[in-house]
């Protein structure tokens, strides 16, 4: 009887230890308003790489205005594409739209979204006349059982004047 009780207590203790919450650190890295500053990408890549070397759980996101504002990127065969290629290479997880993502029109924006290897979310661009695919309003990124929700929202910008 004592052996059964002891075995039962050991089993309960083992189960409790397995179910105990464990402390984990998740690092959230965010960029925004990069405005095609391609010359700064090596520093960004080094910082992200160093973070990934020391932290196991890293999520990389962007809040928009990424591909216009630099002559080299603006005049590329596909304007903006150098930034998207670098962001794909760096392994972004999620992005939303900024007002400057619309600078070249909706068809261009749709092509750029198709070129991204990461999720693009935006909750407040809803229109029957959009020429790019309807974007999901949010996404959930899972890192080792930690679930983080991201909702994309773009500023309501109608332009000057």
Residue ranges and their predicted role:
Residues 1-8:
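Bacterial N-terminal signal peptides that target proteins for export
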Residues 8-11, 149:
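Small side chains
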Residues 10-20:
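Hydrophobic h-region of N-terminal signal peptides that target proteins for export
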Residues 19-161:
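Acidic, metal/ion-coordinating pockets
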């Amino acid at each position: 009887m004592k052996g059964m009780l002891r075995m039962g207590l050991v089993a309960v203790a083992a189960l409790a230890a397995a179910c105990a919450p464990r402390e984990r650190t998740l690092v959230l890295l965010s960029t925004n308003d990069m405005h095609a500053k391609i010359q700064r990408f090596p520093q960004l890549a080094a910082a992200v790489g160093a973070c990934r070397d020391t932290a196991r759980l890293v999520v990389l996101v962007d809040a928009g205005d990424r591909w216009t504002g630099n002559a080299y990127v603006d005049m590329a065969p596909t304007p903006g594409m150098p930034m998207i290629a670098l962001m794909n290479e760096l392994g972004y997880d999620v992005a939303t739209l900024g007002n400057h993502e619309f600078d070249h029109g909706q068809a261009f924006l749709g092509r750029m979204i198709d070129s991204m290897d990461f999720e693009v979310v935006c909750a407040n661009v809803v229109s029957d006349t959009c020429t790019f695919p309807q974007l999901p309003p949010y996404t959930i990124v899972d890192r080792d059982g930690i679930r983080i929700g991201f909702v994309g929202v773009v500023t309501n910008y109608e332009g000057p004047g």
